């Protein structure tokens, strides 16, 4: 039996869109390539603290941060309304591929290590309001640390273990 610990949280279902059972969703992962590659892709709704599989049959982007999803067996706006606000998950095995791109928000809750393997802290928030994206990290001492993040500073992203290994410029941890 699949439990929530074996799944990756990828977003929340929003309100229904239209009359045929589609819904808005804010996702932290871009599933477009995976949706095209997989013959049958299942996403999981968290219902009564249990993961319930639903087959994804429709996927299209509405705006930069809103995706429209359609699931088998949900044929109307009324049927979809009961799932508004439900957390959405998918199997972690899909995250071992290069078919998924993430938003920075997806990394909230990940642990951060420097390139020597020393624990830096846990990501609590992401600030994308500046030119450089900043990770808000709580250190083991309870101190808040803001780290700029760019692809050249990311040494390893381990999604299944929710871990980032970063190249942290000298002196940044002492600020």
Curated annotation (Swiss-Prot):
Belongs to the RimM family. This is Ribosome maturation factor RimM. Residues 99-172 form the PRC barrel domain. One of its GO terms (biological process) is rRNA processing. GO terms for molecular function: ribosome binding. The PRC barrel domain binds ribosomal protein uS19. Keywords: Chaperone, Cytoplasm, Ribosome biogenesis, rRNA processing.
């Amino acid at each position: 039996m699949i439990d929530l610990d074996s799944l990756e949280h990828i977003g929340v279902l929003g309100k229904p869109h239209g009359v045929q059972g589609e819904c808005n969703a804010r996702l932290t992962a871009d599933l477009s390539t995976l949706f095209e590659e997989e013959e049958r892709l299942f996403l999981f709704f968290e219902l009564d603290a249990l993961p319930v599989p639903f087959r994804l049959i429709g996927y299209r982007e509405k705006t930069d941060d809103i995706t429209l999803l359609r699931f088998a067996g949900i044929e109307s706006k009324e049927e979809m309304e009961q799932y508004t606000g439900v957390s959405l998950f998918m199997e972690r095995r899909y995250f071992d591929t290069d078919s998924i791109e993430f938003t920075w928000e997806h990394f909230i809750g990940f642990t951060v290590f420097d390139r020597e393997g020393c624990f830096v802290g846990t990501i609590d928030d992401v600030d994308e309001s500046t030119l450089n994206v900043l990770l808000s990290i709580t250190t083991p001492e309870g101190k808040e640390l803001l780290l700029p993040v760019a692809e050249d500073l990311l040494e390893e992203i381990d999604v299944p273990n929710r871990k980032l290994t970063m190249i942290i410029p000298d002196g940044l941890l002492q600020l």
